[in-house]
Amino acid sequence: MVKRSSHRQVVLDEDDEENYNNNLDDEKMEVLLIPQSNSTTFASSDATQMYKKSRISSNSENKKQIPDTKTLLETFQKIKKTLECPICTEALQRPFTTHCGHTYCYECLLNWLKESKSCPTCRQKLYTQPSPAYLVYEIMNVVAASNSGFPLVGINENPAKKQKEVLFDGMFKQEDSHYPRSILVDSEDGVLRCARCQWELENPYHCDHCGFQISDDQDSGREWFWDGENAESDSSLNGDNTRGGNISTNRAFNNMGHAPITAVPQDWLRFDEGEEFVGSDLESDFSGPGEYDVDDGFIDNRATSQLSPVESDDDFVAPVNGSNGNGITALDSTDSEEIDIMNGFDEERDSGGTNMVSRSETCYNDGQRYDELRRELADIQNESLDSLNSSSNNSPSHNNIHSRQHPFSSDEDEGNIVTNGTGLRSSQSSSQNRGFDLEPYSEVFTASYPRRQARRTRTIQLDSDEES
């Protein structure tokens, strides 16, 4: 029986390979490579050859991964090129990094900023003071220690020793004091924003857009865009009810001396919080449906009784409502407005209303024409009777429900016709046929409405009992 350790030692001696220590890992790998039988374990020649080939290939791969001296020199030259200043193209002296990530010599960057306050590489405007590049400083020390040809001028000057001096002639110190060192929170979506550029913050201590450094002191709280929203909540949490504003806003005033650029007037409140807006006691310009301004001069606010009556067109020929035994059709008024006016006159006369008095005074002035109008109406009725009698002699007269009137005009004595009021003739004829006495209302029917020229008409009734 061949032992595993001795078998492995023999294999290594034949191949002139280095000796390996006997450990558990090697024994496990050898067990996997050497097949075993049920009774005894023997080393197989095929398994031994496979094991030797795997060892040789792994050693050759490890030798290829080790870089040569030429490759190391090329890599070192690239690192030295990276550590050069983009302005003077020399090794960095007191390296300082801007908020956009570019590194320059302090003296080179200072001279550049005096001419243009922007990054020399990307031309981004610089809001904050560049910071010392400590990591670049350590890398330069490592490179200088490994290569004697690397310049060491100014490297030994630690930039941390220059922190107390006024850097960059104080051109960034005054500008930084105008902004609060706390975080601004957008009240609409709750997004953290930078106090200088209002850019959305991913890092709560640094703005990636403008490089603004945000203080992490305990006294520095979060500022809200709208200072009137959280005044009550902040006051209750801090136990300060004596001050009348948002505590965070007051802190911003104390830090800067004036309101931040994101502060808004006190009356700029949100529309969904239900606050009482400034000027809410004034009359609203947005009225609901059916509402109107009572002070509007274009709207007539008088009562109905104070309005003038509406004039209606007068149809002189009235429709046929019936006939007498002689075959003469009685003239009757069907104008409901005139009947309502007469009923209204009765009520006003009985109640002693003031409107009746004013109308009577107006009608009194036109009372002199009433006699002439009544005589004219009588003449027209007589002419109508004559025409009807003559027509009845020529053709048989029959009365039925289908009787109708056929008006026609006559130019005879047209110049003697006088003007009359609205509905006067139809009301006069209707009252006479009904036996109604119009003498007490003589002044009423002669109202002072605009009169129009009337034309004389005649009524002829053509009826037949049987159709031939």
From Swiss-Prot:
Zinc fingers classed as RING-type: ranges: 85-123
GO molecular function: ubiquitin protein ligase activity; zinc ion binding
Superkingdom in the source lineage: Eukaryota
An example Gene Ontology biological process: proteasome-mediated ubiquitin-dependent protein catabolic process
One cellular-component annotation, GO: mitotic spindle pole body
Polar residues bias (residue ranges): 417-434
Biased composition (Low complexity): 386-402
Sorted UniProt keywords: Metal-binding, Nucleus, Zinc, Zinc-finger
Full protein name: Uncharacterized RING finger protein C548.05c
Record CDD domains: RING-HC_ScPSH1-like (cd16568)
Organism (species): Schizosaccharomyces pombe (strain 972 / ATCC 24843)
Localization (cell): Nucleus
Chain intervals for the UniProt region annotation (Disordered): 1-22, 386-468
Gene3D superfamilies: Zinc/RING finger domain, C3HC4 (zinc finger)
